[in-house]
Regions:
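Structural motif
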Residues: 56, 102-103, 133
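Hydrophobic pocket/interface hotspot
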Residues: 38, 50-51, 59-60, 75, ...
Length: 148
């Protein structure tokens, strides 16, 4: 009887751990939809629309090679300064590698980005922390590192 109870506890614990690391299909698709929207906005040269994927808050953090930038406005300014025209922006594609739940309304996503440009192409890796607010997912932290 003790062996059955131990097995049952291990089984319940493993289900609990599994459920804590996997998002529902609906939440995963919602996050991917935001990324798709951002990709389309970027490829249209529209940084204003691209920024809709980020939480519009001073709590937003963007970390890149220049160190952390705090706040939605400062993050937008960084994008506008770094990508002043569509030639430098290029065509963006995302490749999602992993998406996991951290808590009920928080998830992280690891992926690669690729910029196809008439100048030099660029690619790199990113880790995004997402927060679900009033049923919508927003990026609250973005750490992006360029390989080129």
């Amino acid at each position: 009887m003790a062996n059955k109870n131990i097995f049952l506890l291990i089984f319940i614990f493993s289900l609990s751990v599994y459920s804590q690391t996997n998002l529902t299909e609906k939440d995963s698709l919602s996050i991917i939809k935001v990324l798709d929207f951002q990709q389309s906005a970027w490829n249209d040269g529209n940084i204003d629309s691209f920024m809709k994927g980020y939480i519009k808050s001073n709590n937003l953090v963007f970390s890149g090679s220049g160190g952390p930038i705090y706040g939605w406005e400062n993050t937008k300014e960084r994008y506008l300064k770094s990508y002043p025209n569509v030639q430098i922006m290029g065509k963006l594609t995302f490749d999602v590698k992993r998406i996991r739940k951290v808590s009920k309304n928080v998830a992280y996503l690891i992926g690669e980005y690729h910029l196809k440009r008439s100048i030099e192409d660029s690619y790199g890796h990113f880790t995004l922390i997402w927060k679900k607010i009033k049923g919508k997912w927003y990026i609250v932290s973005d750490h992006t590192s360029s390989k080129t």
